[in-house]
């Protein structure tokens, strides 16, 4: 069976222990066309995370963990949806362990990239600049896929840490809102998830 360029690169990477970040184009001439889309995705993901971080900090200072949970539960999905509608993309956050299966569950491609992010982090790469870009073919058409890693900040352990780090009041609210919650037992600096952007290319 003939291997794709990506499969060949991944096979070589596994042999060396280094997993590369690559941008794949359907043909050599596509690279120049794709790069502006990559730049736009990178800028959008960065602005999205900056907005959420600022809002989270403000709400945490004003109302504590309960107010911060509202940012993750309401503000982040609404902001992602607004960007998706504005740009005609699919913008979302996915997690290594999900709190809300309806919103944060990664698809097969996202699962693979999250695993790659963890491997790259184990080799010393920082989450702040960790991204993956790939042009993929799916039954629905060709799309540019972009992911930017999200590391767990120290202040996030009050909602995502070990049982002794999550206050009883927060745990009770999490249990009520997220009966299938698995997004706990993280430590600061762990990979929490990623911003995932999917841009259709067949338009």
Regions found by a protein language model. Give the residues of each.
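Extracytoplasmic c-type cytochrome modules immediately beyond a signal peptide or single-pass transmembrane anchor
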Residues: 27-153, 165-203
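Detector for the c-type heme attachment site
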Residues: 157-164
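Bacterial N-terminal signal peptides
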Residues: 9-20
